[in-house]
Amino acid sequence: MSLLCYNRGCGQRYDPEGNSDDSCTYHPGVPVFHDALKGWSCCKRRTTDFSDFLSIVGCTKGQHNNEKPPEPVKPEVKITSDKKELADFKPKFNELIIQAPKPIECINRPSSDEPMAKLQLKISASLKQALDKLKLSENDKTVTDESGEIKIGTSCKNGGCLKTFAGPQSNEEVCHYHSGVPIFHEGMKYWSCCRRKTSDFNTFLSLEGCTKGTHLWTKKDDGKKVVPCRHDWHQTGAGVTISIYAKNSMPELSYVEANSTVVNIQVVFEGEKTFQQNVQLWGVIDVAKSYVSLTATKVEVFLKKAEFMTWARLELPQKAPAPSEQNETPEEQE
């Protein structure tokens, strides 16, 4: 009877009688997610694509392991008797909440239909070096050889499938994969197409696919694709900075255009990924004194405030649509 190996990066089924010291290729480390990069603590290889991360070949050989790692136990929060006694001594009274006055919005707010102007791009030396290295290593990232044939050992690109190409017979196998995307939320890990959730990353990797199909050995080139990207903002009295954590952005394809109250952002990074964002600004900016800084790890959009003041938020809240007025004729009263 075959058993399932729970070593990180393996997930294969094996025969216990043939389990030797070099049967399993796995990762002894732990998964590391940092600045949109994914990898293992025991390896130096990093990638931004989750399916590529799952297909990273292990760096250590050993025996297969069929022992499922225990899931972390969440500590229970208990209320002691001392806390209950202290709560009884608290004075009971009605709290009076005083709210600060709402900020006064500008009366003469410029129209959002004003002409847009592209902001100045400032390219850092670190980004130039990173782009030069990427151009030199483009040939090393191809999966197929010059004849167009799939190489032995190529991993299936379907999410959740850990099979590798072993020859023409691999094309006849049924691929069990996840058609959705991985979701990490509040310590839980799962696929959007399944309801099975776990807090252990190793268990998440071994979740069997919920969809049957054929293996995908090479990715289809769909050109530029719009993807989400982590971003945030902070402010000083003089300006607002929007940070977009996109690595290796391409200056010739990326731009930011703005007028006094609207900003349109397009960042092309990692060769084929595009981040787009339209922001209706809460305040008013000086377009001529605003600019964009491109570095190897992120893009920073500096917006010079037209007035030295604190913004309540970055975006102007959308006004709720007014309810349709009903034309009713009042009844005549005698």
Swiss-Prot record:
InterPro entries, per the entry: CHORD_dom, CHRD1, CS_dom, HSP20-like_chaperone
Record SUPFAM superfamilies: HSP20-like chaperones
Positions annotated to bind Zn(2+) 2: H27, C42, C43, C59
Record-listed Zn(2+) 3 binding positions: C156, C161, C175, H215
Stated name of the protein: Cysteine and histidine-rich domain-containing protein 1
Positions of the CHORD domain: 5-64, 156-215
Positions with a binding annotation for Zn(2+) 4: H178, C193, C194, C210
Domain CS span(s) in chain numbering: 226-315
Protein residues bound to Zn(2+) 1: C5, C10, C24, H64
Keyword Metal-binding tagged: yes
Function: Regulates centrosome duplication.
PANTHER family registered for this protein in UniProt: CYSTEINE AND HISTIDINE-RICH DOMAIN-CONTAINING PROTEIN 1
GO molecular function: metal ion binding
Record keywords, A-Z: Metal-binding, Repeat, Zinc
Gene source species: Xenopus laevis
Record keyword Membrane present: no
Pfam families (alphabetical): CHORD (PF04968), CS (PF04969)
GO biological process terms held by the UniProt record: regulation of centrosome duplication
